[in-house]
């Protein structure tokens, strides 16, 4: 394919027929949530899923320590109700920049002030997620943080992020390709983590057995 300069130094050359719009032009909503009145005191065991930055990872949502809010609070926070295909993007703290797509099957959900809802329009949600996870999205984030915005990413700054925009067909092809490849890599990583955990347990057991005399070394 014929490539031209993107006009953005750190992006470099891109296919000639791709566009580089600002994030604001391919989304219908960019905004973070808030903490309900009463903070953690209002969390309940069952109810509406309330997502925090520790639930948002690049490989998807992790709900092992998710908290819940009652439906009435969810209604009070209706402006930050999460919809299927929203991109959830961490905008503060050590996990800033992590993002994933909100998928079917979780049910009703809301977010706190550390998570930004990015609602795609005129762009494939999965492609946008990968774009934000890529060098393109993460470089812009680092540049903002270097510029003194160490506290986090503001909605206004986020709206001005550049994103890449191929044709809808190319977006789908790219998203499908990355879904397959990333899934395989994630599986390998998970397998290696289990092996590492087993070896660490083995090491700890060996040390314990030697220092307590259960294993003789002479």
Question: Which residue stretches match the model-derived regions?
Answer:
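Active-site loops and adjacent core secondary-structure elements that bind or stabilize anionic groups
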Residues: 1
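Non-catalytic DNA-recognition/assembly elements of restriction-modification systems
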Residues: 4-34, 160, 164-168, 172, ...
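Low-complexity, Lys/Gly-biased intrinsically disordered segments
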Residues: 19-59, 73-77
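Specificity-determining recognition surfaces
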Residues: 40-42, 49, 134-163
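A short beta-sheet element
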Residues: 52-53, 71-135, 152-154
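Glutamine-centric residue-chemistry signal
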Residues: 54, 113, 138, 150, ...
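Short, basic/aromatic beta-hairpin or loop at an interaction surface
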Residues: 55-68, 90
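Amphipathic alpha-helical coiled-coil/heptad-repeat segments
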Residues: 164-218
């Amino acid at each position: 394919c014929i490539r031209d300069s993107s006009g953005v130094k750190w992006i470099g050359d891109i296919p000639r027929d791709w566009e580089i719009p600002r994030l604001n032009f391919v989304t219908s909503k960019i905004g973070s949530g808030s903490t309900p009145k009463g903070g953690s005191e209002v969390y309940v065991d069952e109810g509406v899923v309330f997502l925090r930055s520790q639930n948002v990872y690049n490989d998807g949502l992790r709900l092992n320590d998710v908290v819940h809010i009652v439906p009435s609070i969810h209604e009070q926070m209706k402006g930050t109700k999460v919809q299927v295909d929203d991109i959830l993007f961490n905008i503060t703290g050590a996990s800033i920049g992590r993002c994933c797509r909100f998928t079917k099957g979780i049910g009703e959900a809301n977010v706190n002030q550390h998570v930004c809802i990015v609602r795609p329009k005129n762009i494939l949600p999965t492609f946008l997620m990968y774009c934000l996870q890529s060098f393109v999205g993460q470089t812009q984030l680092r540049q903002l943080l270097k510029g003194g915005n160490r506290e986090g990413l503001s909605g206004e700054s986020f709206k001005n992020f550049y994103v890449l925009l191929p044709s809808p067909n190319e977006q789908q092809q790219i998203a499908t390709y990355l879904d397959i490849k990333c899934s395989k890599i994630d599986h390998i990583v998970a397998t290696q983590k289990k092996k590492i955990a087993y070896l660490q347990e083995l090491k700890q057991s060996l040390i314990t057995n030697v220092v307590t005399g259960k294993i003789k070394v002479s």
